[in-house]
Amino acid sequence: MYHILVVDDESRIRALIRKYAEFEGHTVTEAGDGMEAVNLCRTQTFDLIIMDIMMPKMDGVQATMRIRSEKNIPIIMLSAK
């Protein structure tokens, strides 16, 4: 199936998304902030990124801009607000 990167500073949210994605047969990698996501995208290949907007170190918007400057990966942005 697909390799999905889930990026959120809340481990419970990452676990919930992982549970549903793995149930559907997808492989999931997790990152706790935008900088970690950018670094993972440089070393791994993902089919989809599900990313929170508000995170420490680097927020989802900044991470999206950096990732998109290097790769063309679909990104779904999440927000609690």
Regions found by a protein language model. Name each.
Residues 55:
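Receiver (REC) domain active-site loop signature in two-component systems and cognate sites
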Residues 33-36, 59-62:
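Acidic catalytic/metal-coordinating carboxylates
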Residues 52, 79:
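Active-site residues of response regulator receiver
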Residues 25-32, 40:
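Short hydrophobic/Thr-rich beta-strand motif most characteristic of the beta2 strand and flanking loop
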Residues 15-23:
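Charged docking surfaces used in two-component/phosphorelay signaling
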Residues 44-50:
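Active-site beta3 strand of CheY-like receiver
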